[in-house]
Amino acid sequence: MAIDENKQKALAAALGQIEKQFGKGSIMRLGEDRSMDVETISTGSLSLDIALGAGGLPMGRIVEIYGPESSGKTTLTLQVIAAAQREGKTCAFIDAEHALDPIYARKLGVDIDNLLCSQPDTGEQALEICDALARSGAVDVIVVDSVAALTPKAEIEGEIGDSHMGLAARMMSQAMRKLAGNLKQSNTLLIFINQIRMKIGVMFGNPETTTGGNALKFYASVRLDIRRIGAVKEGENVVGSETRVKVVKNKIAAPFKQAEFQILYGEGINFYGELVDLGVKEKLIEKAGAWYSYKGEKIGQGKANATAWLKDNPETAKEIEKKVRELLLSNPNSTPDFSVDDSEGVAETNEDF
């Protein structure tokens, strides 16, 4: 429906005044916004990148990753850092839990010599450091581990047993309001790791909740629920965890998709194992009996050998990855869900998702 000429002139004058006062780009028509194509960073898991719909975690946004203890939260964020560093990006790790293991981080592919690290004394200090890094425009990825460990200054200076009702929630709420705009302007990805708590007296529905109040839930563009659903075994030895991630909230694509992958102890996400599974599912890799082949060439007998072959042939692995991304990311109705091939090396646990 056409706007009459007088209204168009008035609108043009108003837009000109706003741009003069607040700068070019402060207001625009949504279709003209060049930032609509969101830049993303890989999570290190191919199936999770596809479940997110955009090929990874969005830059300039807030992301929350939560789950039970030992579910792979820190491992997943370290894989994001490693992927970002491979693209030449600068990353920072705010270690509020004082538990970051640099040796483990290096094993996952993190360049620890170029990783900025801070172990703040208080929650306010941690969030101010995040804000300063974001405003600098020089840091691309910031990880905060974890929201539960962001202790307000008043609580640290008080006695154990004192009541500090709502302090952490108020601190997080103020920080979110301040950070959201700065992150967008500097195109910085901020990832919060969070823990799960149980609500008391919940008879029906899910009693689980995350720490730090509700502000983070609202401001996060992506929320990921990560759970350990099984054990990866070699013979009698447990060598890793079978992991499921559910995209609980997603502002950049359709939510509620989920991905399953293996986290191997000391190695991180079994990326090449995912590549074999998704390659077979999309008929890029042929499987006949126990043998796997690509373009008529046998690449291994059994999934473990096929995975090892792809690891030794990164050019072919990249070619298959590119084809899988093109097939699944171009189709909005696609899902990366797959059953692990013949349940090979997977033992179920009783943990609820």
Curated annotation (Swiss-Prot):
CDD domains, per database record: RecA
Region (Disordered): 330-353
Example of a GO MF term: single-stranded DNA binding
Induction, as annotated: Induced by DNA damage, repressed by LexA. Induced in response to low temperature. Sensitive to temperature through changes in the linking number of the DNA. Induced by cold shock (42 to 15 degrees Celsius) (at protein level). 5.1-fold induced by hydroxyurea treatment (at protein level). mRNA levels are repressed in a mazE-mazF-mediated manner.
UniProt keyword list: ATP-binding, Cytoplasm, DNA damage, DNA recombination, DNA repair, DNA-binding, Nucleotide-binding, SOS response, Stress response
Disruption phenotype: Triple mazE-mazF-recA mutant cells no longer undergo an apoptotic-like death upon DNA damage characterized by membrane depolarization.
SMART domains reported in the protein's UniProt record: AAA (SM00382)
Positions that bind ATP: 67-74
Family (UniProt): Belongs to the RecA family.
UniProt cross-references to HAMAP family, sorted A to Z: RecA (MF_00268)
Quaternary structure (record): Polymerizes non-specifically on ssDNA to form filaments; filament formation requires ATP or ATP-gamma-S. Interacts with and activates LexA leading to autocatalytic cleavage of LexA, which derepresses the SOS regulon and activates DNA repair. Interacts with the C-terminus of RecB, facilitating loading of RecA onto ssDNA at chi sites. Interaction is decreased by ATP.
Function per UniProt: Required for homologous recombination and the bypass of mutagenic DNA lesions by the SOS response. Catalyzes ATP-driven homologous pairing and strand exchange of DNA molecules necessary for DNA recombinational repair. Catalyzes the hydrolysis of ATP in the presence of single-stranded DNA, the ATP-dependent uptake of single-stranded DNA by duplex DNA, and the ATP-dependent hybridization of homologous single-stranded DNAs.
Name this protein carries in UniProt: Protein RecA
Species annotation: Escherichia coli (strain K12)
